[in-house]
A protein has these predicted regions:
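Short aromatic/hydrophobic "clamp" motif used to bind/position activated sugar donors
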Residues: 86
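N-proximal low-complexity "stem/linker" segments adjacent to membrane-targeting elements
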Residues: 1-25
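Short, acidic, metal-binding catalytic loop of nucleotide-sugar glycosyltransferases
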Residues: 24-33
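A conserved acidic beta->alpha catalytic loop
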Residues: 40-51, 90
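Conserved nucleotide-sugar donor-binding catalytic segment
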Residues: 79, 119, 138-233, 244-253
Length: 407
């Protein structure tokens, strides 16, 4: 399949500080049949971006255009590309060396050269100089994504620079909407991935920088555009798609509400809340909640970790009618405080409570916590991944919506 050419398109605006890393990562691909197009979207940095691109000479194809936004730069790249496949590398992101090779190999193995390929990716937090773990979908989401690429979009698992897209999909669905300043990517992913089977590679092939100069942080219209985008998405998803991917419209809207609450998109949150209130609960919800409760046993539940993860998991349990006894945290300054109506204790104090106990491990980095539990001879515990898998057994109860009211 080396005869299939990949066009790596790098749009850039005032990005000389990171551009060299992006171009180098594109040129260093282990897959030989690639071209690199750098689209300068009217940078106003006294020629710094142009000088950086000029260093590469004929190794890249360089285009300059008047400033029109990322969508217009990407569309120029799509018009000018000679390849069979489109790959987008933001000027502040980087491909791992074997990204293109592994994605082409996956296409060869599946036998469908027009299948869209996605992958995991890693986040590089510039201010903290921290390279995070790979962003991975949960088990239930992976099952959905194997059925329909729409699930990946609705779960915000499409980075954009992780994608390898055959050019036929632009002919089928069109290109980026140039009237959108910050949501042009997800607008297109929704159109392109809906109804499509995808390949999802469970390894990170892209490093994505998170920094203060990004458009999503600096363009004033971002929140308004996102509210409009997500309201439009949920209004367009059909009942048939909701049943296929989520089990019911009720479960679909609860998943969308969980996402909305993690964002500043208040209009979207209110819209989805209204959808839930207008629906009846699934007829089998009570029995599913009972089965869920059995997974946590009959003992007292303690949430290990009084941070963001612990609070969120506790909220998800409360939404399903499950109460914890309290929180456990190693930070002495947190101990003996009250969090969400529950006392924070040390592990030693929590284990002195009478009766059976099950510890719910909330931190993402769980190895140290599990080691601590085992050293204390605690064998009844559940990991964050196990808790999340159990929570997927049943959506929240509508009567618990009041728990989500913001102060």
């Amino acid at each position: 399949m080396n005869d299939k050419k990949i066009s790596i398109i790098i749009p850039v605006y005032n990005g000389a500080n990171y551009l060299r890393n992006a171009i180098d990562s594109a040129l260093e691909q282990t897959y030989d049949n690639c071209e690199v197009l750098v689209i300068n979207d009217g940078s106003s940095d006294d020629g710094a971006t142009e000088r950086t691109a000029a260093e590469y000479g004929e190794r890249i194809r360089y285009f300059y255009k008047e400033n029109g936004g990322v969508a217009s730069a990407l569309n120029l790249g799509i018009r000018e590309m000679d390849g069979d496949y489109f790959a987008w590398c933001s000027h502040d992101d980087m491909f791992l060396p074997d990204k293109c090779e592994k994605q082409i190999q996956a296409l060869e193995e599946c036998g469908d050269d027009q299948r869209i390929v996605l992958s995991e990716y890693r986040l590089l937090f510039v201010e903290e100089n921290l390279l995070d773990e790979a962003v991975k979908p949960r088990k239930k989401l992976k099952r959905r994504m194997r059925q329909d690429g729409l699930a990946a979009v609705l779960a915000q698992m499409v980075h954009g620079c992780d994608a390898l897209i055959h050019k036929c999909h632009f002919e089928r669905c069109g290109v980026f909407d140039e009237t959108l300043r910050t949501t042009q990517d997800y607008d297109l992913w929704f159109r392109i991935l809906r109804g499509q089977k995808i390949l999802y590679l469970e390894e990170p092939l892209v490093i994505s920088r998170i920094h203060a100069e990004q458009g999503s942080r600096t363009i004033p219209s971002h929140i308004r555009e996102c509210n409009e985008l997500w309201i439009r998405f949920v209004n367009q998803v059909t009942d048939r798609e909701m049943y296929k991917l989520y089990g019911s419209p009720y479960e679909f809207y609860w998943e969308m509400l969980d996402f909305a609450r993690k964002t500043p998109y208040r209009a979207f949150e209110e819209h989805v809340t209204g959808k839930i209130l207008a629906l009846e609960e699934p007829a089998d919800l009570e029995s599913r909640i009972l089965e869920l409760k059995k997974k946590f046993g009959t003992g007292k539940l303690f949430m290990f970790g009084a941070g963001r993860n612990g609070r969120n998991l506790n909220l998800q349990l409360m939404l399903r009618g499950i109460s914890i006894e309290g929180f456990i945290d190693n930070a002495e300054e947190k101990q003996n405080q009250i969090l969400d109506g529950k006392k924070i204790e040390s592990l030693e104090c929590a284990m002195k409570h009478p009766g059976k106990k099950c510890i719910l491990v909330s931190p993402d980095a769980q190895e140290a916590v599990i080691r601590q539990l085992e050293e204390a001879h605690v064998t009844d515990y559940l990991t964050k991944a196990e808790i999340e898998e159990y929570l997927d057994m049943a959506p929240p109860l509508k009567e618990k919506l009041a728990l989500l009211e913001r102060g």
